Amino acid sequence: MRKRHAKKRHGGVNWLFIVCLLVVIGGSGYLIKTFFFTRDSQVSQESKVVLEEDRRSDNYANLTKEIVAPDSGELDQKIQETNYIGSALIIKDDQVLVNKGYGFANFEKQQANTPNTRFQIGSIQKSFTTTLILKAIEEGKLTLDTKLATFYPQIQGAEDITISDMLNMTSGLKLSAMPNNIVTDEEIIQFVKQNTIQVNKGKYNYSPVNFVLLAGMLEKMYQRTYQELFNNLYHKTAGLKNFGFYETLLEQPNNSTSYKWTEDNSYNQVLSIPAASFAHEFGTGNVDMTTGDLYWYLHQLTSGHLVSTALLQKLWTSSQQSSYHGGIY
């Protein structure tokens, strides 16, 4: 279980959301994300300027097509000049300025990145798991003060660890060993129950095991798999359409191949990630999606369409010991 992070900042008066998903490196989708809310590249690609007036970011269709706004050619050019490889979505004042792919998703097949290329989102998935937990809180299944012992009493210190502690990474939980040859959710939960210890409770310590346990709690509460819960909320309710779990990524025509970064962006070192490595990331980092779907999720979340903004604010102000709250800094 690797450490992969997202960051939360507040300020400004308009939406400004920038998502840049790099070609997957070492099994981690690296995401650079900045959002404010109070309300080749080696592929020769001509910018397709969308002249239509409807570039609103609250229209999901606009997140699936290539867009370079008439006044955003310089932004597009700057991205190309960096030899950036991946997909970029830039939104300002609820208008899509740039939504475009750069470089190759698969160099051997000469398959270019597009707005519909899917990338591993890494630890951003922790925010999705958090929202599922908050949804359960709204449904009265638990609270931020519910103790870990309610679900996993055998874990060291469980009687003093709250859901809030786990979401804020202040539980003190960590693995005493790393799993090998584990490929199912049940196996990783069993391993975690047997190999989790507690150190320095109350202090921030980034440990993905918190979210493995939270995913396990969700399955216990609903008697449904984590993937079923994920699909029900984010596909059926939120309307995400271009995402999936690691088991099906390679089957998708719009998936991205992993490459090791090189100075010349030569695409000459393909990285093969064992399925077991992703299986270990249960609830913490084994989902792939497009930049558009990631934006759509965050837009729905911060607009109060998934859980109440009051509950979000309660979580985000629940700890003075940590700047990390439920998958976002």
Regions found by a protein language model. Name each.
Residues 107-206:
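Active-site-proximal loop and beta-strand segments within enzyme catalytic domains
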Residues 68-79:
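Short, basic/aromatic recognition patches
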Residues 160-208, 212-329:
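Short, surface-exposed loop or secondary-structure junction motifs
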Residues 17-30:
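Hydrophobic membrane-insertion alpha-helices, especially the h-region
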Residues 1-13:
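N-terminal Lys/Arg-rich, disordered targeting/topogenic segments
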Residues 88, 94, 129, 133, ...:
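Residue-level preference for non-acidic, small/hydrophobic
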Residues 78-110, 327-329:
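A short, well-structured edge-of-sheet supersecondary motif
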Residues 35-55:
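Ser/Thr/Pro/Gly-rich low-complexity linker/stalk segments immediately outside membranes or between
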